[in-house]
Design a protein with these regions (language model features):
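Low-complexity, glycine/alanine/valine/leucine- and proline-rich hydrophobic stretches
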Residues: 214-242
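Well-ordered alpha/beta subsegment
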Residues: 241-260
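Charged, terminal alpha-helix-loop-beta segments
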Residues: 1-184, 190-209, 213, 225-227, ...
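A short pocket-lining beta-strand/turn micro-motif at the edge of beta-sheets
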Residues: 206, 215-219, 247-249
Length: 260
């Protein structure tokens, strides 16, 4: 169920490398990056230290992760196909302490916490713990850690600010208009900045993406070719050309006429 719950491809459980065992190794097909999933059983253990240890382990042994992917997926993944800058660690537990929650509340930290709750009727509720919008940078508290320096040189947590930096006020305003229109479609839609674009997701399904350009925006719609109702023929079929974001249709935006 990993694909439905987290939007990830399962690679291997109990993956061992350099005398360390990773509970689950997964792959994010959208960001083209590996994800390490650890199941926390000790409520008082440090998620920061363990998280950076695993991130460092992956960066130092990239070939082993590539080999494992290709052997289990019968694929032909190459080192350059992977965006190592978006590697992350996810801790899963029945509950996290306030200290653990606060420890990962940094806007540029590639470590996530997910809580799992099981109820009497055998239903299971799985939810990620959100970081506050006012969260600080991890660089303010971890500058003297050797592992931190190694990891932060290669791994980057992308933000809307990164992708909007240097853009004109008109483009920023245009982005905000379309972003708000998308979010107003459903309260469960989330904003997920990637390396080259900003993705909008609902329950780990990618709805669309906005690629910020110099004079406008490209909207990529996550619909397969032949399945989009576009009677006015506003979109372009990009199923046979390279592009950012998921989906086979693109709409170039320079004003607000497509908002409705």
């Amino acid at each position: 169920n990993m694909s439905e719950i987290m939007g990830l491809e399962m690679i291997k459980s109990e993956f061992t490398i350099k005398d360390r065992r990773i509970d689950t190794l997964a792959f994010d097909p959208q960001s083209k990056s590996f994800v390490i999933i650890e199941y926390k059983r000790e409520r008082n253990s440090s998620v920061i230290d363990q998280g950076f240890t695993y991130l460092s382990l992956m960066l130092q042994n990239q070939a082993d992760f590539i080999l494992e992917y290709n052997e289990t997926q019968a694929g032909n993944l190459k080192r350059n196909d992977v965006d190592w800058s978006q590697t992350k660690v996810v801790f899963v537990s029945q509950g996290f302490t306030p200290n653990q929650r606060e420890a990962v509340n940094f806007k540029d930290l590639s470590i996530e916490l997910w809580e799992v709750k099981r109820y009497e009727n055998d239903s299971v509720f799985i939810t990620p713990i959100r970081k506050s919008h006012a969260s600080a940078s991890i660089k303010t508290v971890m500058q003297n850690s050797p592992e931190f320096k190694e990891v932060t040189e290669k791994i980057k947590e992308y933000s809307e600010e990164n992708l909007l930096k240097g853009k004109s006020d008109d483009v920023v305003e245009l982005y905000e208009s379309y972003k708000n229109a998308i979010l107003n479609l459903n309260t469960e839609i989330e904003v997920k900045p990637q390396k080259w674009y900003i993705s909008f997701k609902k329950a780990n399904s990618h709805i669309c993406a906005l690629e910020i350009q110099k004079n406008g925006i490209k909207l990529t719609i996550n619909v397969a070719k032949g399945h989009l109702e576009d009677s006015k023929q506003l979109t372009r079929d990009i199923s046979t050309v390279g592009h950012f974001g998921n989906g086979d249709y693109e709409l170039k935006i320079s004003d607000t006429k497509y908002l409705e």
